[in-house]
Amino acid sequence: MEIALALKAVILGIVEGLTEFLPISSTGHLILAGQLLDFNDEKGKIFEIVIQFGAILAVCWEFRRRIANVLSGLTTDPKAQRFAINVIVATVPAIVLALVFGKWIKAHLFNPITVALAFIIGGVVILLAERRDARRGMVTNPRGNALLQAAKAGAPRIESVDDLNWRDALKVGLAQCFALVPGTSRSGATIIGGMLFGLSRQVATEFSFFLAIPVIFGATVYELYKARALLSVDDLGIFGIGFVFAFLSAFLCVRWLLRFVATHDFKPFAWYRIAFGIIVLATAYSGLIAWHA
């Protein structure tokens, strides 16, 4: 195995792991990184599927006890049944739209310019959502009775994943549909969508993680099946490297994000998205980087 190829696998694996669950779009970053590293051919696309699978397994491992409890209680525990129904309801809209428009989206929207514009628009939406929450009184450690009442009045109505009903799940699922546009971010769409629909930042983040499991796992199986003719034993080494680094970086990222959202908002990610999108557009139109359409 070439050292240069192995290094590309390491870089892309880390990029996938760090961006899959942050509201900054893993697909957008992989499209851009793949072009910069000249690793965006058909094998490169299969590689992306493999490292996405590594990232989603990291979430499964982090929430393994919760997943085991839900699976074991599907026939006896109403809470587990409701949770499973919510995940299914939230997953269906994106699957339906992907099956109908998936080919068109990949043919027309998977390019750096679309990604850059989605980065910027998504960043603005995050800022507006955070500003809305601040105006509603979702403040940290309010001081004084007046501020305390304001915080209570504007506080999220859902403070636990177990309190979600199917209508809440459907709203988050509809928000997830926006993530079909590369650069939008699946986690960003579900987290910000959840917050706008009354979920606390922590609940929206946790539910977003659980939604990623059926969505990414299903997409992985489907895409690998379609590309089965291109799979080769010779690629196991490079795929394995990317898989491992995606798993490890995603695992660390998920743990960090769960702690981060307990005391911070998403404004830093919004400004990052806007700045990164502007840089991509500037390099494209200046000719500094020859992004491919």
Swiss-Prot record:
The keyword Transport does not apply. Its EC number is 3.6.1.27. It is a multi-pass membrane protein. One of its GO terms (molecular function) is undecaprenyl-diphosphatase activity. It comes from the Bacteria. It is an enzyme of class 3 (hydrolase). It is found in: Cell inner membrane. Bacitracin is thought to be involved in the inhibition of peptidoglycan synthesis by sequestering undecaprenyl diphosphate, thereby reducing the pool of lipid carrier available. Belongs to the UppP family. This is Undecaprenyl-diphosphatase. The lineage of its organism: Bacteria, Pseudomonadati, Pseudomonadota, Betaproteobacteria, Burkholderiales. The gene is uppP.
